[in-house]
Amino acid sequence: MAREVFRGAIPNDLLYDIRYDMWVRNDGDEIVIGATSLGIFHAGEIIAFTAKPRGAVIDDGRGLGTVECAKTILAVHAPLSFVLTQANEEAESNPALVNTDPYTRGWMVRGRARNWNEDRAALVDAAAYRRHVLAVEPDAQIE
């Protein structure tokens, strides 16, 4: 059976966490976090997303919520330390957005970074993330 080829985007204006295939956008006083198209490709179609409650203090690498896929429930790991200020209610009620529009309407949470300068150093730019994607998925078709 032929292996499915990854096809997805890697926007240039985001930062990426290679450990968890998550993206981060610095949005003024807050950060916005979501799953990358590669992370979604590996997890499988997301059929439910639930974020931790507003005000939750999330440490780097700890769960910011969960996603339910066809055969499993997975923790969504935070790419940095933050205080959760808003979950994307639209994505929680319509998780298909996470699959089809992960970088705009399908974002997962917003928050206030707790250690931005330190945590930022562990994130990579789009060029480095593209190299990571091609190392993991050599036949990837990146938009």
Cite the ranges covered by each PLM segment.
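Acidic, low-complexity mobile loops and tails
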Residues: 1-60, 100, 105-115, 122-127, ...
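Generic structural motif
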Residues: 21, 55, 77-86
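Short, conserved beta-turn/loop elements at beta-strand boundaries and strand-helix junctions
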Residues: 26-29, 86-94, 118
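A short acidic/small-residue loop/turn micro-motif
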Residues: 39, 72, 92-93
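Small beta-strand-rich domains/subdomains or short beta-sheet motifs embedded
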Residues: 50, 68, 74-78
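Generic structural signal for buried aliphatic residues
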Residues: 58, 64-65, 84
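Short beta-strands and strand-coil junctions in structured, solvent-facing domains, enriched
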Residues: 73, 118-119
